[in-house]
Structure formats: C-alpha cells, structure tokens
Amino acid sequence: TFSLTPEVELQMGFGNPLTKRLIEHNGRMAFGSDIESAMAADMFSVIRTSLQAVRHEITLESYEKTNKPPDKMSVSSRNALEWATINAASILSMDNIIGSISPGKKADLIMFKKDEINFTPTHDPIASILFHSGPRDIDSVIINGSFVKRNGNLIDKKLPSLLEKLNESGKRIVHDFLAR
C-alpha cells in the first residue's frame, strides 16, 4: 500500500511516480499532497499528474519496444478516479462506508458547475473532470449528508476566523524567519 504524491515526486526530481509499478504488481495506491508551500493542495492536479505520468511511461516503453505509440492506452480516466475514491477508501478499510455512491454509505459528494466552458463539449464526464477541472469548478460539496460548500461558496461560519488565524500564523512565521 502506497500513498503517492506525484507532483512532488516529479518536481523534486525523485523520478517517475510509483503508479506504473504499482499497477503492474497489483499494488494498492492512494493519493496525497505534500509540501504545501510549493504545491497546491489540489487533488485534481494530483490525480491528473499521476495519470499523465503513467501514460507517459507506457508510451515511452511502447516506443522503445515497437518504435511507435501504444495502439490503445491501457490506463483510463476511470482507473484514475477509482484510485482516488474506492481504492483509497479500501486502503483505509473504509470502503464499506465511503469511496463510492452506494445505499448505506455516507453521502460524500462533489457537484460540478457543468455549464463551464472547460467542460464543453463533454463526451466523457470522468475525463472532463480529471483533465479540465479544478477546485474553481466545484459548485457544491456534501460530506456525510451535509453541505459544506454550496453554489461555489464555503458555508462554514467559522471560516472568517480561521482565515484570520491562518494569516496571523503566516505573518508570525515570516517575521520569525526574517528575524534570524
């Protein structure tokens, strides 16, 4: 079982993410974010980067063996979505509670603004979400049956005070760093 942070692995020069090797060995994987000061905590980017990296490796391997690209890409957008949802839930031993839309599971849902230009035209909704969306395209989020974001806005009443504390913390860290 591995938690992959493909953006960081590529950006820091650690080589190819483990995605392809884990697929080949039926390894279990989930995604994470790392080094938030250098990378956005955006799971769409993490999933997209991992999918693109594994497809790149497959294509290079095909060129090395046949001098041409693969006839068909063996790793789909649906595969990547499953890595981030039901597979991640399974790794946490929570796949009976979360990770898919099923009766009896918690209602954890993300709803997208379908009328955005980056989704038009949409022939494959999963590919459109993974390749063309980001946090800005999320209309609503439901966690355990309750809205936490609606109509594009976070609805936590504590958010303004949390943002204030975050700004104060950031100022203190920069001040302390510069004072050294």
Predicted regions and their residues:
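His/Asp/Glu-enriched, well-ordered alpha-helical/loop segment
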Residues: 17-116, 132
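C-terminal active-site-proximal or functional interface alpha/beta core segments in diverse enzymes
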Residues: 3-16, 40-41
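Hydrophobic beta-strand scaffold residues
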Residues: 1-2, 29
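Active-site microenvironment of metallo-dependent hydrolases
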Residues: 78-180
